[in-house]
Amino acid sequence: MLAKRIIPCLDVRDGQVVKGVQFRNHEIIGDIVPLAKRYAEEGADELVFYDITASSDGRVVDKSWVSRVAEVIDIPFCVAGGIKSLEDAAKILSFGADKISINSPALADPTLITRLADRFGVQCIVVGIDTWYDAETGKYHVNQYTGDESRTRVTQWETLDWVEEVQKRGAGEIVLNMMNQDGVRNGYDLEQLKKVREVCHVPLIASGGAGTMEHFLEAFRDADVDGALAASVFHKQIINIGELKAYLATQGVEIRIC
């Protein structure tokens, strides 16, 4: 059995790490490189960086900080933000990123997933999915351009259908960003994760809702996700990564202990 992964998420805007609630009202957390170094030292298995306004601004992720991060950490990291071409991806990988993640650009041009996978290998192609639960219809819908409130829109894709589609096109991993739960720290959407797990045959990463160590345990134990991504509980030092891993190990979760 592969070890489960603990993944701090760093949302980046204007060269700073920020954090919002349900993708809104972002506050500045701090500088990118020191935070990345801290999480690596605490025992994170990998890091994910989202340049949250790159796609909505029509630009690619700011590459200036990518190489600086690569210089100070020795764990894998993934970068996302406005990657719309093979050239964009090649540059980011050349600066030291281990994976690239696409979200809104994949919705705009699903063939991008296949082209990236063919060029760089499925192992480094992650598809992020921003999913919103509509209580009126009881359905999960994929959203696009979520980094800019004025441009955010609901797509025609239902989440489960899009999960299946991106796998067919070559996604090597899926990060499910559950927007309803984002930043509120009341637990991952286990019901949605279980439904996605049934149709997801590549590594699945849960994102949105972690508030306690038990929430991580539930995601691993009840929804069988491969990794759990979180931001605010780590940024605000509510949960220490080393202590979280020790707790999960006592609960029988296969986890890498530093």
Curated annotation (Swiss-Prot):
GO BP terms: L-histidine biosynthetic process
A Gene Ontology molecular function term of the record: lyase activity
Enzyme class: lyase
Pathway assigned to this chain's UniProt record: Amino-acid biosynthesis; L-histidine biosynthesis; L-histidine from 5-phospho-alpha-D-ribose 1-diphosphate: step 5/9
Catalytic activity: 5-[(5-phospho-1-deoxy-D-ribulos-1-ylimino)methylamino]-1-(5-phospho-beta-D-ribosyl)imidazole-4-carboxamide + L-glutamine = D-erythro-1-(imidazol-4-yl)glycerol 3-phosphate + 5-amino-1-(5-phospho-beta-D-ribosyl)imidazole-4-carboxamide + L-glutamate + H(+)
Subcellular location: Cytoplasm
Any single GO CC term annotated in Swiss-Prot or TrEMBL for this entry: cytoplasm
Pfam families: His_biosynth
EC number: 4.3.2.10
Active-site residues from the entry: 11, 130
Disulfide bonds: none
Assigned keywords, A-Z: Amino-acid biosynthesis, Cytoplasm, Histidine biosynthesis, Lyase
UniProt xrefs under InterPro entries: Aldolase_TIM, His_biosynth, HisF, IGPS_HisA/HisF, RibuloseP-bd_barrel
Superkingdom of the source species: Bacteria
CDD domains linked: HisF
Function: IGPS catalyzes the conversion of PRFAR and glutamine to IGP, AICAR and glutamate. The HisF subunit catalyzes the cyclization activity that produces IGP and AICAR from PRFAR using the ammonia provided by the HisH subunit.
HAMAP family: HisF
Entries under NCBIfam families matching the protein: hisF (TIGR00735)
Summary of subunit composition and partner proteins: Heterodimer of HisH and HisF.
Similarity comment text for this entry: Belongs to the HisA/HisF family.
Protein known as: Imidazole glycerol phosphate synthase subunit HisF
Organism lineage string: Bacteria, Pseudomonadati, Pseudomonadota, Gammaproteobacteria, Enterobacterales
